[in-house]
């Protein structure tokens, strides 16, 4: 499992540069680069900042990492992946739209 590959995958899905992710997660660009390339470990604090930047949980980042191969590609057919892994792959604006749609559907069922 490589957290760095998952971080790179999520960053690119958001269309962010390493500098933008560094700014969002209160760290330096070099730390992001080192993490993505496997040259540096990660602390619980940086994982929390990254999760907040990606609008997900730390456990979702780990889930994504578990479902990636050595090249950063998803291993499983998307139909068999946990919904959390699928959801965090979406850009944040799409995540917000889906959340709104889900809440609207829930409200109409009341």
From Swiss-Prot:
Entry's Gene Ontology molecular function annotations: DNA binding
Occurrences of domain HTH cro/C1-type (ranges): 7-61
Leader sequence residues: none
Free-text disruption phenotype from the record: Deletion of the gene results in a 100-fold reduction in transformation.
Chain residues forming the annotated DNA-binding region: 18-37
Pfam families membership: HTH_3
Recorded coiled-coil stretches: none
Keywords carried by this UniProt record: DNA-binding, Repressor, Transcription, Transcription regulation
Purpose of the protein: Represses transcription of the PilB-specific inhibitory protein CpiA.
Protein name, per record: Competence pilus inhibition repressor
The organism of origin for this protein: Acinetobacter baylyi (strain ATCC 33305 / BD413 / ADP1)
Gene name of this polypeptide: cpiR
């Amino acid at each position: 499992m490589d957290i760095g590959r998952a971080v790179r995958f999520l960053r690119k899905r958001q269309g962010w540069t390493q500098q933008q992710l560094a700014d969002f997660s209160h760290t330096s660009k070099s730390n992001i680069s080192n993490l993505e390339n496997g040259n540096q470990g990660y602390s619980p604090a940086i994982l929390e900042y990254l999760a907040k930047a990606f609008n997900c949980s730390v456990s979702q980042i780990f889930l994504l990492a578990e479902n990636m191969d050595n090249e950063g590609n998803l291993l499983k057919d998307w139909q068999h992946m946990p919904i959390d892994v699928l959801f965090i792959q979406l850009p944040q604006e799409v995540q917000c739209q889906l959340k709104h749609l889900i809440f609207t559907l829930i409200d109409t069922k009341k």
